[in-house]
């Protein structure tokens, strides 16, 4: 019970309580599960608390905006594009208190080192991303980030076939590329029963 209370209230802890130590929060789940929306909600709360916030996203994700993170529900927050995790570290100002990172799965494994370093400096690090690729395999560096995070939030979507809680991102077009940026035009949320690994477009809609 104490652990559950800590997870619910961690974002409201004043810096005087946690001293100089930062922490890492990971928001993970399938597409359309509200990851970016939850990230933006936490960032807005930090700004209301007058904390300095910086937000980053991978350069390759320009689906909705070049200089904002945007949820599927149209929530928005200003962000800076980064080509690599090391570039994020270089861009973080010394007085920044909260760092938000969206689409963590698109960064390399160096993101783990960067997140740890920022937390060591006393920064609250919030990372949102897909924990599985379109085949259902763990998507690095998200598993490693989940292992080192103090706080983890697992989000779920609604299966587009049966309406049950969805944990998978079903690709609805033919491609074997692991990274294929898209939205509802290319992917559907699926539950365990309805998810078809390696499915191509004709199979998906049977």
Show the residue positions of the predicted features.
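Conserved P-loop
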Residues: 2-94, 133-144, 157, 172-173, ...
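Catalytic-core regions built around general acid/base machinery
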Residues: 42, 113-121, 141-148
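Residues at the starts of beta-strands that form the adenosine-phosphate
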Residues: 52, 124, 151
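Short acidic/histidine-rich motifs immediately flanking catalytic phosphotransfer sites
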Residues: 94-98, 104
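Conserved acidic residues
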Residues: 97, 149-150
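Structural recognition of the conserved hydrophobic beta-strand(s) that form the central parallel beta-sheet
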Residues: 100, 123-131
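Conserved ATPase-coupling elements of RecA-like P-loop NTPase cores
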Residues: 103-118, 132-139, 203
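Conserved AAA+ ATPase "SRH/arginine-finger" region at the nucleotide-binding site
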Residues: 151-162
């Amino acid at each position: 019970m104490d652990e559950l209370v800590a997870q619910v209230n961690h974002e409201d802890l004043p810096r005087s309580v946690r001293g100089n130590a930062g922490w890492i929060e990971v928001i993970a789940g399938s597409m359309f599960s509200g990851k970016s929306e939850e990230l933006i909600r936490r960032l807005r709360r930090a700004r209301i608390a007058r904390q300095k916030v910086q937000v980053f996203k991978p350069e390759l994700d320009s689906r909705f905006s070049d200089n904002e993170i945007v949820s599927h529900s149209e929530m928005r927050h200003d962000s800076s594009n980064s080509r690599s995790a090391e570039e994020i570290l270089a861009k973080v100002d010394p007085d920044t208190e909260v760092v938000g990172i969206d689409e963590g799965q698109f960064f390399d494994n160096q993101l783990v080192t960067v997140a740890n370093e920022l937390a060591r400096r006393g920064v609250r690090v919030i990372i949102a991303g897909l924990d599985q690729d379109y085949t259902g395999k763990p998507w690095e560096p998200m598993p490693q980030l989940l292992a080192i995070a103090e706080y983890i939030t697992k989000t779920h979507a609604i299966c587009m076939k049966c309406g049950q809680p969805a944990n998978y991102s079903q690709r609805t077009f033919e491609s074997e590329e692991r990274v294929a940026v898209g939205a509802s035009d290319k992917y559907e949320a699926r539950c365990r029963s309805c998810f078809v690994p390696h499915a191509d477009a004709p199979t998906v809609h049977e």
